[in-house]
Amino acid sequence: MSAVPVSDVHAYLTGLQDNIVQALEQAGGESFRTDTWQRPEGGGGVSRLIEGGQLLERAGVLFSHVHGTRLPPSASAHRPELAGRSWQAMGVSLVLHPRNPYVPTTHMNVRMFVAAARPGHDENDVFWFGGGLDLTPYYAFEDDARHFHQVCRAALDPHGAAYYPQYKRWCDEYFYLKHRQEMRGVGGVFFDDLNEPGFDASFALLRSVGDAFLPAYLPIVQRRRDTPYTQAQRDFQAYRRGRYVEFNLVFDRGTLFGLQSGGRTESILLSMPPMAQWRYDWQPAAGSPEAALAGFLQPRDWA
């Protein structure tokens, strides 16, 4: 029988949260607030957040590690052989909503799930990893999108040439608003149910994705953060943030599962922007920078 080294993953994830928060605090000159919470049914987490900042208008970098004694049938519907096992789930997730409309919003998540072997049974722990990172710009800059995707490709290529194209396509398909017929942003990479290469190789790939976040995103922040903007550009940012809200509340599996299963609402909704706006049948002026964004919201080869 084989046991998954949960403590190694826990140590990596808490270190990743610390590293990202420290880098963002250094970049923005503002401190994250810490909210430590416990889950009555088992486990808890640490939420690090900023609201009303100058660089980051709203941001959350969250770590959670929750566990239970019996995997509920709803969670094992596609793996009925796991029903009744004890389980653990842990991960780091973040969403950053900058104030300047020229700085893109971004999202990153890395996570692991383990269903433990039952005592007295000839079986192994069952694990899988998932995660990804993606970019949601409000104004279209090709060099930003290419940089983000090039870092994603460089993170995955050492693990196999097939990973980046596969995970990039998965991201394009997942972060898609069917009713708007557009992607949420310019994508990135997204994966789930990763365990086939074995624990060590799967965990190494997860670390590569988590470690890619800062080099993928911070150079874009530094490039755009001092770009002057007007209230009209802030209004367009709020309008596009409305699409972010639509995706999260209508399509995002993690948000829907969390809200429907009695998850921690404050953590789940920390992904929401501080302000969003809807306008009836509004269209940007032809040839405007706002209109140019539409060309970024369909799948493209960036790297």
Curated annotation (Swiss-Prot):
Involved in the heme biosynthesis. Catalyzes the aerobic oxidative decarboxylation of propionate groups of rings A and B of coproporphyrinogen-III to yield the vinyl groups in protoporphyrinogen-IX. GO terms for cellular component: cytoplasm. NCBIfam families: PRK05330.1 (NF003727). Residues 244-279 are annotated as: Important for dimerization. It comes from Bordetella petrii (strain ATCC BAA-461 / DSM 12804 / CCUG 43448). The active site is at 107 (proton donor). Gene3D superfamilies: Coproporphyrinogen III oxidase, aerobic. GO terms for molecular function: coproporphyrinogen oxidase activity; metal ion binding; protein homodimerization activity. This is Oxygen-dependent coproporphyrinogen-III oxidase. It catalyses: coproporphyrinogen III + O2 + 2 H(+) = protoporphyrinogen IX + 2 CO2 + 2 H2O. Keywords: Cytoplasm, Heme biosynthesis, Metal-binding, Oxidoreductase, Porphyrin biosynthesis. Its EC number is 1.3.3.3. GO terms for biological process: protoporphyrinogen IX biosynthetic process. Belongs to the aerobic coproporphyrinogen-III oxidase family. Pathway: Porphyrin-containing compound metabolism; protoporphyrin-IX biosynthesis; protoporphyrinogen-IX from coproporphyrinogen-III (O2 route): step 1/1. It is found in: Cytoplasm. A divalent metal cation binds at residues 97, 107, 149, 179. Homodimer. Its cofactor is a divalent metal cation. Substrate binds at residues 93, 109-111, 262-264. The record marks 179 as: Important for dimerization. The keyword Mitochondrion does not apply.
